[in-house]
């Protein structure tokens, strides 16, 4: 059951990522139709901006994420021996280099990982998590975060965030060009085409315009669907490492029962946390939820 869940989650992730790239190209094609009356120009624009933006995002240092979330590095075992030992042992079991260790001075129990590869990984936990969890529960949470690093989830989420940003940029470019009348020549040629080809060209233009307007919303929903799926995969992978689903289940129950929201959370970092720092109590995932409900995560763990 465990390995079936892992395999199913990986397959779903592949489909979501492929769909995401296709969606970006579709947005580019729609913008090409709107701006130049030529979808190929839009495809090229989307590909160039997409590749450039992804490269910038992937090359960004994980230290930026840590700074945004006020995380301070633990540089020696003596500073936090239990945390250090737990990260070290879970990394060893996972077969990856030991990530850097950070602590966020916040009373709400939570954790996150960053780093685009296992060699550049880092794990951060809040002070509230260290104070609230027993060691075997902490192992479950750390195994979850180590799994994110081992499964290259941070790289995937970085690419997804970049693609959402690219779609927003492309949509904004199209809207500005339309608003400021920068495509007047294109409109004139389109009118000529409409006289020759009836209303088909106008219908294509309107459909493309609606698609571009809705694209950022759809892209955000796809990004969050990917995020929710990777959380399920990290849970299953954590059990693979610890061989103890009860530790992770108990940790999730304790975190769910804690009503304290994190005091300072970067909005762009919400999706990387172990559980939603906004403390959502919903039992069913919404389209724009970065995390699946804790009750759903516990149910899956209990069925392993």
Swiss-Prot record:
<feature type="transmembrane region" description="Helical">
    <location>
        <begin position="39"/>
        <end position="59"/>
    </location>
</feature>
<keyword id="KW-0645">Protease</keyword>
<dbReference type="GO" id="GO:0004222">
    <property type="term" value="F:metalloendopeptidase activity"/>
</dbReference>
<comment type="similarity">
    <text>Belongs to the peptidase M48B family.</text>
</comment>
<keyword id="KW-1003">Cell membrane</keyword>
<feature type="active site">
    <location>
        <position position="145"/>
    </location>
</feature>
<keyword id="KW-0862">Zinc</keyword>
<protein>
    <recommendedName>
        <fullName>Protease HtpX homolog</fullName>
        <ecNumber>3.4.24.-</ecNumber>
    </recommendedName>
</protein>
<keyword id="KW-1133">Transmembrane helix</keyword>
<feature type="transmembrane region" description="Helical">
    <location>
        <begin position="14"/>
        <end position="34"/>
    </location>
</feature>
<dbReference type="GO" id="GO:0006508">
    <property type="term" value="P:proteolysis"/>
</dbReference>
<keyword id="KW-0472">Membrane</keyword>
<dbReference type="InterPro" id="IPR001915">
    <property type="entry name" value="Peptidase_M48"/>
</dbReference>
<dbReference type="GO" id="GO:0005886">
    <property type="term" value="C:plasma membrane"/>
</dbReference>
<feature type="binding site">
    <location>
        <position position="144"/>
    </location>
    <ligand>
        <name>Zn(2+)</name>
    </ligand>
</feature>
<feature type="binding site">
    <location>
        <position position="231"/>
    </location>
    <ligand>
        <name>Zn(2+)</name>
    </ligand>
</feature>
<dbReference type="GO" id="GO:0008270">
    <property type="term" value="F:zinc ion binding"/>
</dbReference>
<dbReference type="Pfam" id="PF01435">
    <property type="entry name" value="Peptidase_M48"/>
</dbReference>
<feature type="binding site">
    <location>
        <position position="148"/>
    </location>
    <ligand>
        <name>Zn(2+)</name>
    </ligand>
</feature>
<feature type="transmembrane region" description="Helical">
    <location>
        <begin position="202"/>
        <end position="222"/>
    </location>
</feature>
<feature type="transmembrane region" description="Helical">
    <location>
        <begin position="159"/>
        <end position="179"/>
    </location>
</feature>
<keyword id="KW-0378">Hydrolase</keyword>
<keyword id="KW-0482">Metalloprotease</keyword>
<dbReference type="InterPro" id="IPR050083">
    <property type="entry name" value="HtpX_protease"/>
</dbReference>
<keyword id="KW-0479">Metal-binding</keyword>
<keyword id="KW-0812">Transmembrane</keyword>
<dbReference type="InterPro" id="IPR022919">
    <property type="entry name" value="Pept_M48_protease_HtpX"/>
</dbReference>
